[in-house]
From Swiss-Prot:
An annotated GO cellular component: cytoplasm
UniProt-listed PANTHER family: TRNA N6-ADENOSINE THREONYLCARBAMOYLTRANSFERASE, TRNA N6-ADENOSINE THREONYLCARBAMOYLTRANSFERASE, MITOCHONDRIAL
Gene Ontology biological-process annotations: tRNA threonylcarbamoyladenosine modification
E.C. code: 2.3.1.234
UniProt-recorded name of the protein: tRNA N6-adenosine threonylcarbamoyltransferase
Record-annotated membrane-spanning stretches: none
Length: 355
């Protein structure tokens, strides 16, 4: 299965295989990050991202096929992320996949980008359903019950900012380079996490939703109170912000796991995916939550937590095994709910949160 990923600022192509027993193998996984193109703007510029996908995608697909050592006739299908994401990039990837499928008379699978994240641990760790997914990235923050391929129940979501977006915005306030998440984590190692008393959003609530906009505002207010911001101030602000995120996340996940068990029984694992899962402090907090809940934590390797083609190819292979294929009229989608019956929590609606 060839997989194509172009939903944000990574251009990626990969080839994976799936055995009859469900075991997966990555034959190639080629990713070209656009970080340098967007760094000078302090964030992703959709038009620049789409143009970069156009320039790079054909070359990356060729490289992935060569590395896998197969030709197009050997493909069982072509999978592309059809959303949710920046619509220009989604169109580039999906249109390319349609062309390949049409020319080589092979099935097309239009993959939900979030489903690809959700199914990645079945590629890396061959885990059984049902499991609890914590997906945290620059565009999404969700707790999802993964009951089967195509069977997802969202237990909690952010009502405003995504977690990765909050890290990036705090980094920008403090003058740290883009992408900001790793910069905040690094600065926090040298900081005093108790210096600034930031709020712990949503803590103690009976639902499993997240909120990060108020915490982000609290950081901005503290910066404004400082006459000048020293290197130590930056470290202390980052450490205090990250500590608040950790405590809030742990609380939300404890509630999410309780909701999971009420509906599905004990999960086979707590799984973390998305770029935020690369943060070692957050991994530590997740591990503590998993142990307290009597389950294990599974985090795919960093290269498979962030956006990549292998996860798209694997989701395509899982869907193809169930006979789920798409026609040439499969639409690109800027918004695409993972769980078809999901309701926006309360009055909130935020495209970046995945609604």
């Amino acid at each position: 299965m060839l997989g194509i990923e172009t939903t944000c600022d990574e251009t990626a192509a990969a080839v994976v295989s799936r055995d009859s027993d469900g075991k997966g193998h990555i034959l190639s996984n080629v990713v070209r990050s656009q970080t340098d193109e967007h760094a000078i703007y302090g964030g992703v510029v959709p038009e620049i991202a789409a143009r970069a996908h156009v320039e790079m995608l054909d070359h990356l697909i060729d490289a992935a096929m060569r590395e896998a050592g197969i030709d197009y006739a050997a493909l069982s299908g072509v999978a592309a992320a059809a959303g949710p994401g920046l619509i220009g990039g989604v169109i580039v990837g999906l249109t390319t996949a349609k062309a390949i499928a049409l020319v080589h008379d092979t099935p097309l699978i239009a993959v939900n980008h979030l489903e690809a994240h959700a199914l990645t641990p079945r590629l890396t760790d061959a885990i059984d359903f049902p499991y609890c997914l914590f997906l945290a990235s620059g565009g999404h923050t969700q707790i999802v019950a993964v009951a089967g391929v195509g069977d997802y129940v969202r237990l909690g979501t952010t009502v405003d900012d995504a977690m990765g977006e909050a890290f990036d915005k705090v980094a920008k306030m403090l003058g740290l380079p883009y992408p900001g998440g790793p910069q905040v984590e690094q600065a926090a190692r040298n900081g005093d996490a108790t210096r600034f008393a930031f709020p712990r959003p949503m803590q103690g609530r009976s639902d499993a939703n997240f909120s990060l906009s108020g915490l982000k505002t609290a950081v901005r207010n503290e910066i404004g109170r400082l006459e000048s911001v020293s290197e130590q101030d930056v470290a202390d602000l980052c450490a205090s912000f990250q500590a608040a995120v950790l405590e809030s996340t742990a609380d939300r996940l404890r509630v999410g796991l309780d909701l999971f068990e009420q509906r599905f029984g004990a999960p086979t694992a707590l799984v973390a995916a998305g770029g935020v899962a690369a943060n070692q402090a957050i991994r530590g907090a997740l591990d503590d939550v998993a142990q307290a809940a009597g389950t294990r934590l599974i985090v795919p390797p960093p290269a498979l937590c962030t956006d990549n083609g292998a996860m798209i190819a694997w989701a395509g292979a899982e869907r193809l095994a169930l006979g789920l294929v798409d026609g040439m009229d499969a639409p690109p989608r800027a918004r695409w709910l993972l769980d078809a019956n999901a309701q926006v929590p309360g009055k909130f609606a935020n495209t970046r949160a995945g609604f």
